[in-house]
Amino acid sequence: MFQTRRQRLNQNLLEKNMQAVLLDSPSNLYYYTGFTGGEAVFLMFVSEQDTPKTDCSINQGLDSGNAKEEQLKTNQVYLITDSRYYEQVEKECPDITLIRMENQGFSEYVKELLENYDDNFNESHPQSIVSNSKKSKELMYTIAVEDTMNLELYLKLSNACPDNQFVIAKDAIMESRMIKDEAELQTIAKAEAIGDAAFTHILDYMKPGVTEADIALEIEFFMKRQGASKLSFDTIVASGPNSSMPHAQVTNRKLQMGDFVTMDFGCVYQGYCSDMTRTVAIGEPTEEMRKVYQIVLDANLRAMEAIRKGVKCNEIDAVARGYIKSQGYGDYFGHGLGHGVGLDIHEEPRFSPKCDVITKENMVITDEPGIYLPGRFGVRIEDLVVVKKDGYEKLSHSDKQLIVL
């Protein structure tokens, strides 16, 4: 599985004339290697063959002192980390060459690997030669990095490897992750099912006098009891006037009769995130509140019916946004309609006016329109949806009709 993902990454990088890729975010480390530990750097040299080569027989005792061994020149896939994770790498990533950090930082090890790979690199990537067949110091690699790379690491790499160019290549790195395989879809569906169960559970808990913090904690405890490892983001419980803030912080405000309460929450199950939002009423809502709720629900449903393979993301956003505007509330829907979900809670692509990515089958994206009337109340309804060839599959199954408690 991980080798197949690296093959796709390798092909994406070849098409963009990159000679190597360096990753350090936990989600990308896991996606491309299976490593679930902490600090590490993944370095892969791009190969014109289908599969970048690695020789794990050299894992034992490999450090900066012997990193110039001849055999390193033919390896193309490395994971650099310290002694806290040696055993973990060997168990989780048996097909990756482990570089054991000891007395130097990541940038020094990357520098050595780049220098030692030069001879082999010339043959497969002649375009990387800056000056006709000169020594290795005259070579420059174009190395793809994430847009989330820590600035300190980026500066250290740039200083240690001045003859190389580190280029943000978000599209090449994230393209594979946008399309989920069957195992990923099943895991995300299970994570979302935990969220659905949490919503059903929390309804019996909600009544006047209970605080937003009480509700948020109960949701978290319930999801963890159902097998979630952690929250996928800080739970939002926004009641009364707080619900007009899309990302309100949880407070000790007590629920009151006449409140709308918006709950946006999710969990991580076996590494993958869920995300859902529901708005409920405490006591009988006003006519205006019911009207706004129905507009948001209709926008959610209209957008969902537009979801299918081959549609631009901004066109789907426009369906919901245009409908809300036609009902007179266009100024009160300020955020994008949705975002990708997977190993991270916010992934590509996005349902937003700026995103012209064309949807592909098995993308997992949220559909979450909202209307927010400052200082009064707000409504958001969010489902998690899988893009299909001729439509969609909804992973969120909680009731979306207005629930009055």
Predicted regions and their residues:
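Active-site neighborhoods and metal-handling regions in enzymes and metal-associated proteins
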Residues: 1-405
